[in-house]
């Protein structure tokens, strides 16, 4: 990881030299005029203005001026949050996942590119779960040295197999190790991949230890779980269940009663694997049998999202599981949820705004357009409530008061 930091430093130098191309930052006060504004919590405002000072929103005032950015005619909303991504995954020089023969420098460039295209797609915060190489990328972006979304990382996940798995005490030690390595959240695999059948890989006792230790350290827990592992993760007190395919309605009701978040993936990740089958097949963990299983999983995912959406009080957040081939296309998951699962478009938007922020413990900082929140603001050419494909047309991106994308005309003082 030390050499990865060196390579990212090289990228930083290049970014600093080219910064006027990538970002437009106005010191002091910025006023954005909007015609249609989604506040991130389900409310729509019309014909108003957003006032920003530094990195924060300080007012919503229809009389504020002068206007710096005129976004009337567009749909303005908080920057999206992807609760489940793998920002360092990329295809290598051989075209394959993981990239046999790829140098550390090439991996660092690819990670920086993934971060950039994700930001350009309107995602101003992501949870990358996880890889140790997330850490230097997260830190470079947080310091403003590289452009990209705000990153929360799990560093190294507890896999449920191999050397990380052991007694409850050994698992607690592993969780502490991730905290020391800079983890923002803990990722736990309680099930095998759905490509290997999705069977449970941790006992209830092991899950209890992992989730309890994380809680003692002030860390949230995301648990990769299918079938019976969904209930086990919920009983263990995890923060969020990832995937959740084949969970029963009773499992989902238990999650709602416990306040456990659900992060299902309706389509993008499976569609991406199938689209890039030749680039994954034969790499570790990707077999012909696994792809046959994935071809059957989409209807199951759609069924889960439909059923989960009907469970009162169940908090469903937006996560894509974006891997190599999907970075920058994260918003396709919105289309899958609305088109294939019948999710209300505004519910889909808030799942990637205030609800995802709440799941990350950042509900008072990001995910809403209101005074006191980070100025993470995007604009779409179109209205996603009428045409969900508008999520593909992100024409303006601001993160923390810095404008990184501005395709509409700009009004300057």
Where are these regions (language model features)?
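Histidine-rich, glycine-flanked metal-binding segment
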Residues: 25-28, 37, 41-77
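Metal-associated gating/positioning segment near the N- to mid-region
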Residues: 74-143, 205, 228, 233-236
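Short, acidic/polar
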Residues: 107-115, 165-178, 225-230
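Divalent metal-dependent hydrolysis catalytic cores, especially in the metallo-beta-lactamase
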Residues: 108-134, 148-159, 181-193, 220, ...
